């Protein structure tokens, strides 16, 4: 058994540098988009796009006469889902 543990310890030493890299990976500048001379954060555009897409989804649901329970929770979840998908896709 000591050989297995020593091999694991050697592998840990080889990959120990990865842990600090992941810890500081979020320390970069926030993505800002210049619009007419002002810089707006990326999450702002994701929220606007998400709101528009949620309203389009709401319009489609209304036109198809689908009755939803817990409408507030559903639309809030759709808004969050769309915002995160935009963030994942574009940032």
Curated annotation (Swiss-Prot):
One GO cellular component term noted in the UniProt record for this chain: plasma membrane
Residues in the signal sequence: 1-26
Entry keyword annotation includes Membrane: yes
Keywords: Cell membrane, Lipoprotein, Membrane, Palmitate, Signal, Transmembrane, Transmembrane helix
Sites of N-palmitoyl cysteine lipidation: 27
Annotated TM spans: 33-53, 70-90
Compartment(s): Cell membrane; Membrane
Main location: membrane
Presence of keyword Transferase: no
Membrane topology: Lipid-anchor; Multi-pass membrane protein
Lipid-attached positions, S-diacylglycerol cysteine: 27
Similarity section: Belongs to the YtcA family.
Name by which UniProt lists this protein: Uncharacterized protein YtcA
Organism whose genome encodes this protein: Escherichia coli O1:K1 / APEC
Gene name of this polypeptide: ytcA
């Amino acid at each position: 058994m000591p050989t297995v543990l020593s091999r694991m310890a050697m592998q840990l030493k080889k990959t120990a540098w990865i842990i600090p890299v992941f810890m500081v990976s979020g320390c970069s500048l926030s993505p800002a988009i210049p619009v007419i001379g002002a810089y707006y954060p990326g999450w702002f555009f994701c929220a606007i796009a998400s709101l528009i897409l949620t309203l389009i989804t709401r319009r489609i649901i209304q036109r198809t006469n689908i009755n939803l329970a817990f409408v507030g929770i559903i639309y809030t979840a759709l808004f969050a889902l769309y915002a995160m998908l935009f963030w994942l896709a574009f940032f």
